[in-house]
Structure formats: C-alpha cells, structure tokens
Amino acid sequence: MFNEKDQLAVDTLRALSIDTIEKANSGHPGLPMGAAPMAYTLWTRHLNFNPQSKDYFNRDRFVLSAGHGSALLYSLLHVSGSLELEELKQFRQWGSKTPGHPEYRHTDGVEVTTGPLGQGFSMSVGLALAEDHLAGKFNKEGYNVVDHYTYVLASDGDLMEGISHEAASFAGHNKLSKLVVLYDSNDISLDGELNKAFSENTKARFEAYGWNYLLVKDGNDLEEIDKAITTAKSQEGPTIIEVKTTIGFGSPNKAGTNGVHGAPLGEDERKLTFENYGLDPEKRFNVSEEVYEIFQNTMLKRANEDESQWNSLLEKYAETYPELAEEFKLAISGKLPKNYKDELPRFEFGHNGASRADSGTVIQAISKTVPSFFGGSADLAGSNKSNVNDATDYSSETPEGKNVWFGVREFAMGAAVNGMAAHGGLHPYGATFFVFSDYLKPALRLSSIMGLNATFIFTHDSIAVGEDGPTHEPIEQLAGLRAIPNMNVIRPADGNETRVAWEVALESESTPTSLVLTRQNLPVLDVPEDVVEEGVRKGAYTVYGSEETPEFLLLASGSEVSLAVEAAKDLEKQGKSVRVVSMPNWNAFEQQSEEYKESVIPSSVTKRVAIEMASPLGWHKYVGTAGKVIAIDGFGASAPGDLVVEKYGFTKENILNQVMSL
C-alpha cells in the first residue's frame, strides 16, 4: 500500500527536478513533473538496482529513453545515494556529472547515453537481448545466474521515431519477456498538441508486434502503476504500459501545455507549483530524511539483498558447473581469452579472397576462441559472411544460439548492438552492406560517444559492386564514418589486414569499430606477419618499396592497395623510387607520434598520389597541395564491376599517368 510519505517522495522528486532546471535556467521540467509517480513506483517497488554497486552484473537495467527528462533521473540517483546534491545544482554545467542528457560512463547509474529519441528504447531491446542470450547460455536448473529485467521510460517522441518500430518488431518477434516499457503518454509534444502529428492506436500497434499492452488511466495512481508493472513481469513477451500523465503536473498555468516541455517554469510559476504540491517554495533542493529513508529501506535494501543472494548462488554455481562458471566470469569481466589469437587464420602470399570472405573465415575462428562473440546481420548474412557456420540461430526457442536474425532493420540492429555492448558479457557485432551504413549512422555516432566495444561489419564497399548500380555503391560513406570521433574505420587490403582488423575490434575497449570489406577478391600482400600486425594497429604502414626516402608515395586503402603495388612495380622498372603505404585506419594513424607518421609519410616527399574508390574528402591532408587524389566525385554506375572500376580510372595505367604528371 502507498501512503502520504510516498506522495511526499513523488512530489520531492518533482521539486528537485524543477529546482535543478531553474538553477541551470535550462532543461525540460514537463516530463519529470508528469512521470515522477511511475518512476518512483518502479524504483521503490520493483527495480533491483543499486547505483552505488554499479558493477553488479545481474542488476535490473533502467533506461530513460526520453533523455531530455534527465533531471528526473538525476533526482532519483540523488535520493538513492549515488549523486551528491551539489551535482544537481551544477546541472548542464561544465565538468558536472549531470549533463543535459544522460551519459554512459559519465554518471554512475546511467546504463546508456540517451537523448536522440528512439535510440534509448532500441538500445533497451539490445539490453534485453543480451540478458536473454546469456540466460539461455549459462542458466541451469536452480541456477539462474542471469535473471534481470530491462525497464524503459519512453515518451511520445520515442514512439514516433522510425527506429522504435524496427526495434519493437524485433523484440516482439523474439518474445523478450524481460523488457518492460513505461510509456509516458501525455498528449503533448514540443510544438504543441500531439494529435496534430500523432494519432495511432498504441494498443493495436504493439499487440500487432507481439507485445503485451497495459493501460494506466491515471498517471498519479501509484497502486495502478504498481499493479501494471507486476502484471508485466508475469507475462510472456515484452510489455508496454501506457501511463496517461499530465505534462508539467502541478503547474497551475503550464500543466498540459507545450510551454512546460522544454523551458524552466520561471520563479513565479515555481512558487505556485510548490504550493500545489504542499511544499515550501522558500526551500530549494530540499529533501526530507524520510524520503531518503524510503529509498534506503526499499530499493537499496532490496538491491543489496539481491546482490548478496546472487553472489552466494554464483559460488554454488562454480562448484556445480566449474567450467561454465569460469567462462561466465570471463564474459562478465569483458576480457578476452589470453590465447584467443592463436587460432586466427594466417593467409599465405598467393591467396586471393574477398575481404568479406576472409572476414568470414576469421569469424569462424573467433567464435571458437571467444565464447562471448555474438551477433548477426540485417538479412544479408550470406553476403556479409557474418554467420557462425556451425552454430544454431538465436531465437526465443534457442536463446543460446549465436546467429541473430536482425531482419531488414539496420538502425535497430545498430542500437541493439550498442545495447548489448553496454550490457556486458558479450562482444557483439552487426552486419550489412556499406551503403546502408547510412541507415544506422546515428547508432554509430552514439556508439562512439559511449565508447563501446561494438563491431559493425560493412561489406560491398565500393563501385566494384558493379551491376547493382549507384544505389548500392558507397561513395561518401567512408568519409562520413571517418569523420565520427572515436570510431575505428578499418578498410583492410587483404586477408591478413582483415585478421588484424578483427583483433583491433575485439580489443578496443572504449572505441567501436567499423570494418569496411570488399565483395571482390584481393591478393594477399607480400608483407611479413609482424609488419602487418604492427602496421594495421598503427593505422598506416609501408607495404612495398624503398625504405630510403622515395621519389614518389602511393597512398591507398583496401582493394586499391594491391593496385598501387602493381603500379609501383612498373614505376620501378622505369627507374623510379616509390613507396606504397596502406592506410587502413586513419583514426589510429592520427594517434601515432609525429616521428612515426613522418617515417611512413615523409614530409620531404611531395610527389604523392592517393587512390581510393570513394569520395576524395580527407585525402588532401595526406597528399598535400602538390599531390593528386584518384577518387570518385560523383556516384557509381550499373555494369559489371571490373568495367565500372576501369571506367572510373582505377587502373594501373591511370595511376602511372597521374604519377608521371606530378
């Protein structure tokens, strides 16, 4: 039963949120004021989560998908003991732990970075997917070592975003029963009344996806909210609870209007609102001891007991299933097996293979040595070569399966991979054609912001795709991905560079990786293994030519490296001194010392030609004003791939002509 103390706690959360925003003179008070009752009920009655014990693996995950309501989350984190009151007073200020939108690894208790609407909802699907897979893999009768819920607080905006449709469809199809979404349904958007833009039947929509739908008609009714969450936890499949709320509840002049969505109340309205709550407007950032005690005696007590029981269970699990327990402990540590690289393939000089196919060979080896390896493709597994051949598919019936069928849902796949990476216990990946990286670009950006160990496989990387034509031939995508800070964009030149690229991807604890791979075959370069290993990790290195300062530099990535080597050999026959540099990862190269960069691309050599079947954007930094770039300024064409490549000037003869014209 709920009582007056509970109502005091709810109103305290509202007041804290208001004061946090007023102090900053910036923020979104409407959602915290309307959604405080559902958040309070969830945290005090259901959530197994202690923000002071952030490394407890079996905790419930809470995601504020409506990240603009961050003041509510920070208020909850404060009353539950993990965020100092002073941090609320520094909301949205430089160096504070309370940024405008919640940030992963910045504030304890924040599971994923949210703000771009729809992505929190969709990353939550990834969190629930990770829980389901790990539970299927590790749980044994009487030993549910992975057993937690993912709770989401989502807004109208989240559900309008296209990604929510993709993610909800995937979650329903896979019966992710541990996913519970609380939908703050307040009928107001930033611009005004919601019905001017959004009138769909939420119940019919989600039931069509295979979700359970529950309705709480009064968002201030704590008992009904509690019952709905309890019901959701007992049902098969994911559940959405539509909670009808009033945005800015308690504000006499702004409640129920868009005026309270994204701007502070103002001092006069704050005073009237506090009086409506029965609180003293003269007291700012005020929390009574009894409110702290409620969270101490409910949420924190429950979470501590749950963690203690789990630790005891894990000890017994280790006694009964020692090998499985060791694998589980390694997985949740996020570390790789010490000798995981030993079984990775080495490709001999003379081997000819598409880097997507060589990647597929590497994937088979990784799956045997890295048990936490898990992912799939957006309906292109056969083309991406991304499936584990001897593994079962992931499904609601076989959650332990390794191959995820994401379907044609690229954006949701990207967000789900991010969610799995944030969850822990997995080294996740997703795959599609490179040209469709645009469909998940916002997820790639968020992955980089969060600093996740996530891998994205992009195949069919150039105009060499051929017959499918310009809609399927990437041009600007490479430059676009390279522009994302903290993103490893690796375009390997052969099978061995591909192997090392995968090593980088798996080992990059705080940087996501995009692997950009070919459809067409590439010859293995005649380069020693240790040189390739170091060179790919450093982003660029010499693969052919003079160790002394050369007359000419040929710079390239991916499939164009072997073409550059062919041209270099002809130049040498003409008595020219030339060096070929493979540049698979610009991001890594830029992090090297000036001494190393100078050793690879000597500043004294001004006769430089860069070769890449993509936009020239970015290459002029490396070729300088005296150099040339053989690239593509327009779109591709539909014809056999070899012919398209020739017509666009990616031939040995054109390279020689460009070099000799310098």
From Swiss-Prot:
* An MF annotation (GO) of this entry: transketolase activity
Its encoding gene is what? tkt
Indicate what this protein is called per its UniProt record.
Answer: Transketolase
The entry's function note states:
Catalyzes the transfer of a two-carbon ketol group from a ketose donor to an aldose acceptor, via a covalent intermediate with the cofactor thiamine pyrophosphate.
Family as reported in the entry's similarity comment = Belongs to the transketolase family.
| SUPFAM superfamilies associated with the record | Thiamin diphosphate-binding fold (THDP-binding), TK C-terminal domain-like
The record's annotation in Pfam families points to: Transket_pyr (PF02779), Transketolase_C_1 (PF22613), Transketolase_N (PF00456)
- SMART domains noted in UniProt: Transket_pyr (SM00861)
